[in-house]
A protein has these predicted regions:
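Sec-dependent signal peptide cleavage junction
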Residues: 20-33
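Bacterial N-terminal signal peptides that target proteins for export
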Residues: 1-11
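Acidic, metal/ion-coordinating pockets
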Residues: 31-324
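Solvent-exposed loop/linker segments at secondary-structure transitions
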Residues: 46-50, 92-99, 111-114, 230, ...
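Hydrophobic core
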Residues: 12, 16-20
Length: 406
């Protein structure tokens, strides 16, 4: 009799555990809502509309380029015709395309041409000061083209208006209203509704010395925005396009801090630090993803909604944008037209053209990546510094004082 009781109790215990499996998160894929979401992402493209030459594993390769990105995006759309495409900011500054930033808004318009749904700004969007950002936004709007929604939730307009808006702040405020910049937007993709908000990080602000705007704390502003979304919107997913970034030290990793403090965010597209994450960082039910800089990779993540409303990652891939990918002809034609504008509106004033070779040498220079990764003296940095010294010493305003580049 005692043995029978023990067996019965054991069977009941197993039955209870099996019944709890979905609650414990075991086999969560089997207990989903049937909703699926494919997300494409980029960040820190820095005006790299054209492909560029770089060193990969000791070999020179041609990588990146929006025309190749377009090919990859179209291939992804063959699998799912309506993916969500998010961008994490710093879409400008880094090539000659930046010289027509205000007059052509080339970067933002080309993101729209690729099908980007939502982006945010990064610190480099302020490089041409308040008037530059305002002019660029107004130009993009006036183009009449399909441009991405622009979101950022932590601009502190109340504090600025209380102190009295400066001319630059007023310019940006007017441009925001004209373009339609918001704290967040709601995007419908198939049967999935996604709220996407943007946030501008602390280090990004430190890296934007020409920025005149005041900002709320990114975490507190994100908390308020997520609560507003939960209160006012019936959405399946909350995503954040963040220009804050991740670093190795988790205690200083801004987007990891964001994920821990605002756990209702499902997905964070993390820009600013040029990080390439070969697998998502996960904190609770929040996933952080990054694909590296300059359009070297197209980030892809496929997710399925669980029965508790949160999301599982099914697949995650960073697709390298290499010269093996055929460039989309129509996209390249648009880029070539923009480069002609660079020739006409900028380089011609100095007697140069975009394809002109200025110098040749037999020395193998260190790469730009080396300068990012190795904070020490490098021959590329040396020649750049020497060029600045030469330019100053040969300018009409040079007063004879010694020139030093620190």
């Amino acid at each position: 009799m005692q043995r029978t009781k023990k067996i019965t109790a054991f069977v009941l215990a197993i039955a209870l555990c099996v019944g709890m499996l979905p609650t414990l998160g075991v086999n969560a894929k089997a207990a989903d809502t049937g909703k699926h979401m494919d997300v494409l992402f980029t960040h820190d493209t820095h005006s790299h509309l054209n492909s560029f030459s770089t060193i990969v594993d000791g070999k020179q390769e041609e990588v990146g380029g929006f025309a190749r990105l377009k090919t990859l995006i179209d291939e992804q759309k063959e699998k799912n015709p309506d993916p969500l495409y998010l961008d994490g900011g710093d879409f400008s500054m880094g090539t000659l395309i930046q010289t027509v930033y205000e007059t052509e808004a080339a970067e933002l318009r080309m993101l729209g041409y690729l099908g980007c749904d939502v982006t945010t700004w990064g610190n480099h969007e302020f490089d041409y000061r308040s008037s530059g950002l305002a002019n660029m936004l107004n130009t993009a709007k006036a183009s009449g083209e399909n441009v991405p929604s622009l979101v950022v939730c932590n601009v502190d307009w109340s504090a600025m208006e209380k102190a009295g808006l400066t001319e630059g702040q007023q310019q940006i405020k007017d441009a925001f209203e004209n373009y339609g910049v918001k704290d967040y937007v709601v995007v419908q993709k198939g049967d999935v509704k996604i709220a996407v908000f943007g946030v501008f990080g602390k280090d990004s602000l430190d890296c934007a010395p020409t920025c005149e705007l005041l900002f709320e704390d990114p975490i507190e502003a994100s908390k308020k925005t997520v609560e507003e979304i939960k209160k006012n919107e019936d959405v399946d997913m909350i995503a954040c396009v963040s220009h804050s970034g991740t670093v190795e030290d988790e205690d200083k990793s801004e987007d990891e801090i964001l994920a821990k403090n605002v756990p209702d965010i499902d997905l964070i597209i993390s820009g600013h630090t040029h990080t390439q994450l070969d697998k998502p960082i996960q904190h609770g039910d929040t996933y952080i993803v990054s694909c590296g800089e300059y359009g070297r990779n197209l980030g892809t993540i496929s997710m399925t909604q669980k029965d508790d409303g949160r999301w599982n990652v099914d697949t995650y891939e960073l697709i390298p944008v290499t010269d093996e990918i055929k460039a989309d002809a129509a996209t390249q034609e648009r880029i070539d037209e923009l480069m002609e504008t660079v020739d006409t509106n900028y380089l011609s004033h100095f007697g140069y053209t975009k394809d002109q070779i200025l110098a040749e040498n037999d020395i193998e220079f260190s790469s730009v990546d080396d300068m990012y990764n190795e904070h020490e003296e490098l021959n590329l940095g040396d020649i750049m510094s020497d060029a600045y010294v030469y330019a100053v010493e040969n300018s009409e305003y040079y007063d004879g004082d010694p020139v030093d580049v620190a």
